[in-house]
Amino acid sequence: FNDLVQLTQGNPKVDGQQLMQHINQSLTLRRQYMQLLQQLAFATSPVQAAASSATSSAASSAARIISRKSAEFELLFKPDKQFSGQVYVILKIPHSIEKHHNQGVRINCCSNELISSIHFPPIVDGKTQLLMEESDQKFINMFDAEFAIYLS
């Protein structure tokens, strides 16, 4: 349980990848982690749209959004001009706290069946960024309207 709390609070020293595998394999752990996120996250972006009744491939492409905004943060992406298939994911936090300047920020993307988590570098001048592959499932989840976002 302590590891779940540490991951929820954005501790970069926790082995997030291994812990997320355990969380996604256990409904009990997933529920506990979701409860912790709802209590401890400093910012959230809820599910953006209701599920479409179209086919699954059409629904997933229709559910893609280009940015997530809330009062606490903005998450957007820009394609890399030199390398096709790569994107810069930019996280802007206008009122970040000291922890985010030292440890960075963890973004948790949550649906009913899956939770993915990615750690961003420390905030500098109100923003941070990562270079990712467009095909990376974590990138896809961040900009899928059917995933809620929790920042810690």
Indicate where each model-derived feature is located:
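Generic alpha-helix signal with a bias toward terminal, lower-confidence helices
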Residues: 8-11, 35, 45, 119, ...
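Generic preference for flexible, low-structure residues
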Residues: 20, 35, 39, 45, ...
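Acidic-aromatic/histidine active-site loop/patch
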Residues: 1
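Short alpha-helical interface elements
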Residues: 29, 44-48, 116
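N-terminal amphipathic alpha-helical interaction or autoinhibitory segments
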Residues: 6-35
